[in-house]
């Protein structure tokens, strides 16, 4: 099933916009309201699975934390394994780490060293694309382990914050269900 305009509008309307959160001047797009609606949540997963079902994906990677909520069901729908990428010291086995820039400092993400095998074709899934820093770090981790990643899927794309362009420079094609301006 290809996403219809009516389905995408339904998803967009299921996402609440919160003014002045987490600070004044920010319009926060709250994907948790989509999760509260089982029809919207199921539709978002179905549309992503449909898009990638014939893409030869062997693993789905989701970034902490809301990427888990969308990545794991997409992996199940595709019949492949799910790999979490987490904040430091949250994964029990041997990991590798990648640092990335935040607005005021840096952060790190980790992945198990045995979670991705050389040649795995990986789809990265997250709830929202803003500047692309988190996904760029995730892609670097996957590639360091020998995985091939060319696509990333999102529920929301804050299209004017530059994430899609940033990831395109890394050879990543981005797909999102719901575009919003990112003011």
From Swiss-Prot:
Pfam families: Pribosyltran. It comes from the Bacteria. GO terms for biological process: adenine salvage; AMP salvage; purine ribonucleoside salvage. InterPro entries: Ade_phspho_trans (IPR005764), Adenine_PRTase (IPR050120), PRibTrfase_dom (IPR000836), PRTase-like (IPR029057). It is found in: Cytoplasm. Keywords: Cytoplasm, Glycosyltransferase, Purine salvage, Transferase. It is an enzyme of class 2 (transferase). It catalyses: AMP + diphosphate = 5-phospho-alpha-D-ribose 1-diphosphate + adenine. Pathway: Purine metabolism; AMP biosynthesis via salvage pathway; AMP from adenine: step 1/1. Its EC number is 2.4.2.7. One of its GO terms (cellular component) is cytosol. GO terms for molecular function: adenine phosphoribosyltransferase activity. Belongs to the purine/pyrimidine phosphoribosyltransferase family. Homodimer. Catalyzes a salvage reaction resulting in the formation of AMP, that is energically less costly than de novo synthesis. This is Adenine phosphoribosyltransferase. It comes from Citrobacter koseri (strain ATCC BAA-895 / CDC 4225-83 / SGSC4696). The gene is apt.
